[in-house]
Amino acid sequence: MNYLVMISFALLLVIGVESVRDGYFVEPDNCVIYCMPSSEVCDRGCKHNGATSGTCKEFSKGGNVCWCKGLR
């Protein structure tokens, strides 16, 4: 059993774990970026900050805000 744990741990170190997350696109003061129903501004801003894509999340709890997928 100990060998299995050690081998699993070694594989994680060798392979490397790269994780991404989804989340709101925010300004430096941690305020969300509001958007109009057009997702182009969100997509450009999210990609500029390392995400794979961005969209305008309409009618959410905080209003129309930018949502990014795959943030690094």
Curated annotation (Swiss-Prot):
Residue ranges of domain LCN-type CS-alpha/beta in the record: 21-72
Gene3D superfamilies per record: Knottin, scorpion toxin-like
UniProt-listed GO biological process terms: defense response
Localization per Swiss-Prot or TrEMBL: Secreted
The entry's keywords: Disulfide bond, Ion channel impairing toxin, Neurotoxin, Secreted, Signal, Toxin
Pfam families documented for this protein: Toxin_3
GO molecular function (one): sodium channel inhibitor activity
Disulfide bridge partners, by residue number: C35-C56, C42-C66, C46-C68
InterPro entries, sorted: LCN-type_CS_alpha_beta_dom, Scorpion_toxin-like, Scorpion_toxin-like_sf, Scorpion_toxinL/defensin
Record bears the keyword Signal: yes
UniProt similarity note: Belongs to the long (3 C-C) scorpion toxin superfamily.
Annotated domain remarks: Has the structural arrangement of an alpha-helix connected to antiparallel beta-sheets by disulfide bonds (CS-alpha/beta).
Annotated protein name in UniProt: Probable neurotoxin pcD-1008
Species in which this protein is naturally found: Androctonus australis (Sahara scorpion)
Lineage, opening ranks: Eukaryota, Metazoa, Ecdysozoa, Arthropoda, Chelicerata
